[in-house]
Amino acid sequence: MAEKRKYSRKYCKFTEAKIDFIDYKDTSLLKYCLSERFKIMPRRLTGTSKRYQEMVEKAIKRARHAAIIPYIVDRKNVVSNPFEGL
Protein backbone atom coordinates (compact mmCIF):
# COMPACT_ATOMS: atom_id res chain seq x y z
CA MET A 1 0.00 0.00 0.00
CA ALA A 2 1.29 3.45 -0.88
CA GLU A 3 2.42 5.78 1.86
CA LYS A 4 0.45 8.93 2.49
CA ARG A 5 2.17 12.20 1.77
CA LYS A 6 2.84 14.40 4.74
CA TYR A 7 1.74 17.96 4.21
CA SER A 8 2.73 20.87 6.36
CA ARG A 9 -0.25 22.72 7.76
CA LYS A 10 -0.85 26.03 6.03
CA TYR A 11 -1.38 29.04 8.22
CA CYS A 12 -2.38 32.61 7.60
CA LYS A 13 0.72 34.81 7.43
CA PHE A 14 -1.38 37.92 8.01
CA THR A 15 -2.77 36.54 11.28
CA GLU A 16 0.73 35.60 12.44
CA ALA A 17 2.00 39.11 11.68
CA LYS A 18 -1.09 40.63 13.39
CA ILE A 19 -1.89 42.92 10.46
CA ASP A 20 -5.09 44.94 10.94
CA PHE A 21 -5.49 46.43 7.48
CA ILE A 22 -4.04 45.50 4.09
CA ASP A 23 -3.23 48.64 2.12
CA TYR A 24 -3.48 48.59 -1.66
CA LYS A 25 -0.28 50.67 -1.94
CA ASP A 26 1.84 47.99 -0.23
CA THR A 27 2.76 45.97 -3.32
CA SER A 28 5.35 43.80 -1.58
CA LEU A 29 2.61 42.43 0.68
CA LEU A 30 0.16 41.97 -2.19
CA LYS A 31 2.62 40.10 -4.42
CA TYR A 32 2.58 37.24 -1.91
CA CYS A 33 -1.00 36.49 -3.00
CA LEU A 34 -0.44 36.90 -6.74
CA SER A 35 0.72 34.28 -9.23
CA GLU A 36 3.50 34.88 -11.75
CA ARG A 37 0.85 36.12 -14.19
CA PHE A 38 -0.59 38.47 -11.55
CA LYS A 39 -3.72 36.43 -10.93
CA ILE A 40 -5.15 36.28 -7.41
CA MET A 41 -4.14 33.03 -5.71
CA PRO A 42 -6.91 31.07 -3.94
CA ARG A 43 -7.05 30.51 -0.20
CA ARG A 44 -6.28 26.81 -0.49
CA LEU A 45 -2.86 27.61 -2.00
CA THR A 46 -1.84 30.59 0.13
CA GLY A 47 -3.36 29.46 3.42
CA THR A 48 -4.85 32.85 4.25
CA SER A 49 -7.99 33.05 6.36
CA LYS A 50 -11.33 34.10 4.89
CA ARG A 51 -11.19 37.54 6.50
CA TYR A 52 -7.75 38.38 5.14
CA GLN A 53 -8.45 36.82 1.73
CA GLU A 54 -11.36 39.22 1.26
CA MET A 55 -9.16 42.16 2.28
CA VAL A 56 -6.38 41.01 -0.07
CA GLU A 57 -8.79 40.65 -3.00
CA LYS A 58 -10.21 44.11 -2.42
CA ALA A 59 -6.73 45.64 -2.09
CA ILE A 60 -5.50 43.94 -5.29
CA LYS A 61 -8.53 45.15 -7.23
CA ARG A 62 -7.98 48.69 -5.96
CA ALA A 63 -4.28 48.55 -6.85
CA ARG A 64 -5.14 47.34 -10.36
CA HIS A 65 -7.63 50.15 -10.80
CA ALA A 66 -5.02 52.67 -9.64
CA ALA A 67 -2.48 51.12 -12.09
CA ILE A 68 -0.05 50.16 -9.32
CA ILE A 69 0.00 46.51 -10.39
CA PRO A 70 -0.89 45.20 -13.87
CA TYR A 71 -4.04 43.29 -14.77
CA ILE A 72 -2.15 40.84 -16.99
CA VAL A 73 1.42 40.14 -18.08
CA ASP A 74 2.75 39.20 -21.51
CA ARG A 75 3.86 35.61 -21.88
CA LYS A 76 7.30 36.64 -23.09
CA ASN A 77 7.89 38.51 -19.83
CA VAL A 78 6.89 35.51 -17.69
CA VAL A 79 8.54 32.58 -19.43
CA SER A 80 11.91 33.08 -21.04
CA ASN A 81 12.68 31.36 -24.31
CA PRO A 82 14.54 28.09 -23.55
CA PHE A 83 16.22 28.21 -26.97
CA GLU A 84 17.59 31.71 -26.50
CA GLY A 85 21.38 31.85 -26.55
CA LEU A 86 21.89 28.52 -28.35
Swiss-Prot record:
GO BP terms, alphabetized: translation
Provide one Gene Ontology cellular component.
Answer: cytosolic small ribosomal subunit
GO molecular function terms listed in the Swiss-Prot or TrEMBL record? small ribosomal subunit rRNA binding; structural constituent of ribosome
On whether Magnesium is a keyword of this UniProt record, the answer is: no
Which Pfam family, any one of them, does this sequence belong to? Ribosomal_S18
Q: SUPFAM superfamilies, per this entry?
A: Ribosomal protein S18
Q: Which residues form a coiled coil?
A: none
The cross-references to InterPro entries, in alphabetical order and at most eight, read: Ribosomal_bS18 (IPR001648), Ribosomal_bS18_sf (IPR036870)
State the UniProt keywords alphabetically. Answer: Ribonucleoprotein, Ribosomal protein, RNA-binding, rRNA-binding
Q: What does this protein do?
A: Binds as a heterodimer with protein bS6 to the central domain of the 16S rRNA, where it helps stabilize the platform of the 30S subunit.
How this chain assembles, per its entry, is: Part of the 30S ribosomal subunit. Forms a tight heterodimer with protein bS6.
Give the family from UniProt.
Belongs to the bacterial ribosomal protein bS18 family.
Q: This chain belongs to which protein, by name?
A: Small ribosomal subunit protein bS18
